[in-house]
Amino acid sequence: MSTYLKFAGLGALACLVASCETPGTQATRQAATAHGRRITNVRTTAYTHTERGGRRNAVGKNLSGQGHVSAAADWSRFPLGTKFQIVGTQDRYIIDDYGGALVGTNTIDLYKTSRGAMRLWGVRRVDIDILEWGSKQMSLKVLAPRRKNGLVRRMIAGIEANKS
């Protein structure tokens, strides 16, 4: 009987502790992985080349749907060249693009090769493993000539504020 009470008490304590975690801390929870860092509860959306931006990414190359697939993000949060994998899948991506709606968010926009695949993805929250962090210096080099754009200026300010 006393063993049962101990387990019941531990279970109740675990539930209490878990319920104290707020959605904000869940969204930014990070853990070390073999490759770098796991980031949990990342909001992802999808885009494709038939949308306004066309087939080229921010560095002027074709969007990639193979190997490390193209992805867009706020470069002050995920610098140009950041490679990551969606946990539990073989899906690997590289940040080689950005989008105005992503600036100031932790959202990553995943490239899909068709509108159907883009719609099928929709909006999902996923855990990602950072395989390799991109370069803040390269991000700044690409963004500097585009400084007239207000959203680009916000990314540049974010990168410069987080240089470490």
Show where each model-derived region lies.
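Solvent-exposed, well-ordered loop and adjacent helix/strand elements within mature globular domains
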Residues: 20-164
